[in-house]
Design a protein with these regions (language model features):
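Ligand-binding pockets and gating/stacking loops
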Residues: 1-385
């Protein structure tokens, strides 16, 4: 009956896992996905008051005496059956655009990086709430007992290597159990800190220590009734299993040459976005519930035409490869991929000078940037049916 179906979704949910390719810093939608030929024609014209309508501008350009409009720093081309407009900076993503759902109406109230990133990770600008991956772990449970439900990977962009810092609270569990916090896998010799046994300690000795420690913790739990004690026991056991599962997962030496080629020239360089995309696929194959990639360096306040080329080159081929690799393995059907940052960039240029007579010269020389723009920007999704 109708009454029995009121709580059912219109379509059966397919997503079991998520890969969030977070582009930290705020990618410029004008130079990647949002084709505006009229804006190119208006290059150098001051932002019309009919558009601004007295709205507050973000801090780094609020002191400019003028706001010259700047079109895209690159050309655009239409791709696929959907004829999606994609920048020449992203040819690989353009070629798979029919696999993508572009959302060009994103909006946020945050105008600075930290509250904006925090909002996208937790649903609140105030720090301390559980992150998205923690909620998925809490609500859906684990699919793999040998790896965390929620894994975090970080990479730095070549466009602006010294990007905005990221903090571990972005993948924190907040008021949820510590079982649901994200675990960062690093590209260094020890992917997870303090996971390896000291050289003088054998695996058998470690097992005996954990068994004894578990007995002590169980006594503490009976005495005080604190659930975090049992959580600690579970975390010690997970760490023990991860001593085997993490090195196996982080090792990409057995990836076929054609797969490494698919992900691009940086695929076998640990810590790069390309290498992390391969690791994301491996984690999804092992049924990790939520994989969070952060790629830093998208904060182009100056020298945007040059910096954004490096950033786009970092992510273009690996992102497309990840989507198609999951598809050919039958994993895209129940894996949701999200690509995007914390806000967009302004349609006017951020200048190092406020002299109007120099605006056009600065823009033509490519020495401009774009300020933060929270009111409208673009992300895309793929997969999950």
């Amino acid at each position: 009956t109708v009454s029995n179906n009121l709580n059912l979704p219109h379509f059966a949910p397919k997503a079991k896992r998520i890969i969030y390719l977070f582009q930290s810093g705020g990618p410029s939608q004008h130079d990647l996905f949002d084709y505006k030929p009229k804006l190119n024609e208006m290059k150098g014209i001051d932002l019309p008051e009919s558009v601004r309508m007295g709205q507050r501008l973000t801090g780094m350009t609020s002191g400019q005496s003028n706001f010259p409009l700047v079109g895209s720093a690159t050309n655009f081309k239409q791709y696929g059956e959907a004829r999606a407009w994609v920048s020449d900076l992203l040819p690989y993503i353009g070629k798979i655009s029919d696999e993508l759902c572009f959302i060009k109406s994103m909006h946020t109230e945050a105008i600075n990086h930290d509250p904006a990133v925090t909002f996208f990770q937790t649903g609140s600008q105030q720090p301390g709430r559980p992150s998205m991956g923690s909620w998925l772990s809490y609500g859906l449970g684990s699919l793999n007992k040998n790896l965390p439900d929620f894994v975090v990977l970080l990479s730095r962009g070549t466009g602006r290597p010294k990007g905005q810092p990221l903090y571990s609270r972005l993948w924190g569990n907040g008021f949820l159990s510590s079982l649901h916090q994200g675990v960062q896998f690093r590209s260094a010799k020890d992917p997870v800190l303090f996971l390896k046994n000291p050289e003088s300690l054998s695996k058998q000795e470690r097992r005996k220590m954990l068994d004894y420690l578990s007995e002590l913790n169980e006594e503490q739990e009976k005495k005080f009734g604190d659930k975090e004690v049992s959580n600690r026991i579970s975390q010690y056991e997970m760490a023990y299993r991860m001593q085997t599962s993490v090195p196996e997962t982080m090792d990409i030496s057995d990836e076929p040459e054609n797969i490494l080629k698919l992900y691009g020239p940086n695929a076998n360089k640990p810590g790069t976005y390309a290498a992390n995309c391969i690791l994301a696929r491996k984690l999804i194959e092992k049924d990790v519930r939520f994989v969070q990639l952060y790629h830093m360096g998208w904060d182009q306040h100056s020298d945007l035409p040059m910096q954004i080329k490096g950033q786009a080159n970092d992510v273009d081929q690996p992102t497309a490869a990840l989507i198609m690799d999951l598809k050919q393995r039958g994993l895209l059907e129940d894996t949701l991929i999200v690509w995007g940052g914390e806000f967009g960039r302004t349609s006017y240029g951020q200048l190092q000078t406020s002299l109007s007579k120099e605006d056009l010269r600065v823009i033509k020389a490519g020495k401009y940037g774009r300020d933060h723009h929270p009111r409208c920007f673009t992300i895309f999704m793929a997969g999950a049916g």
